[in-house]
A protein has these predicted regions:
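Amphipathic alpha-helical packing segments from all-alpha helical-bundle domains
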Residues: 57-62, 101-128, 135-136, 169-177
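Hydrophobic/aromatic-rich alpha-helical bundle segments in the mid-to-C-terminal region
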Residues: 123-177
Length: 186
């Protein structure tokens, strides 16, 4: 826990540029040997932090019936958006994930994909909608909101929407809900 807290704090304060095994060891008070033993590398430690804080890897949404399915989907996307908006470390970690490709990142992506496909299967089974349709809409919503949350750290306005303020995100979420309502109304 101390290592994960330390890595999160270091990412907030310094970004990834100054994160190395020596700096993490010094700041956390945990020996390099223990870091290597439990995480194999600095990337392994960062991946453990992502696994602990990632929305999709820690979601437990179950869609049990068609009546509750749509409200649950809306809640799921709302929680995803709010998590991204309120967790600057997670946004930085997603940027890091996009900038490299290794076995640790591949494993994280595979785990996230399994969770996503499970959710898609549940929605398809309950709604009778084609898998391609649900998967594409989910990809569009998830990718676009993730991108906008990451962009909001550097660019306050996108397509005239103020993405570094609550009102802009209320507008975005409202249209996510409208998309979902249109899809499931047919």
């Amino acid at each position: 826990k101390r290592l994960l807290d330390t890595i999160g704090q270091m990412i907030i304060e310094q970004g990834f540029e100054k994160i190395g095994i020596n700096a993490v060891s010094a700041q956390s008070g945990v020996s390099k040997i223990l870091i290597y033993r439990y995480f194999n590398s600095i990337d392994g430690l960062i991946a453990a932090y992502i696994r602990k804080h990632d929305f999709w890897l820690n979601t437990s949404f179950e869609f049990s019936d068609t009546v509750q399915m749509l409200p649950a989907i809306k809640e799921m996307f709302y929680k995803h958006i709010e998590r991204l908006r309120t967790d600057p470390v997670l946004r930085k970690l997603y940027r890091w994930e996009l900038s490299c490709n290794n076995d640790i990142i591949a494993s994280l992506r595979e785990q996230r994909e399994k969770v996503g496909m499970n959710l898609i299967e549940q929605v398809c089974t309950l709604s009778g909608r084609p898998k391609q349709e649900i998967a594409a809409l989910s990809a569009i919503i998830t990718a676009s909101t993730t991108y906008l949350a990451m962009l909001g750290d550097y660019c306050p306005v996108f397509n005239g929407i103020i993405i570094d303020e609550d009102n802009g995100w209320k507008q975005i979420y409202k249209e996510v809900v409208n998309l979902l309502d249109i899809l499931f109304a047919n």
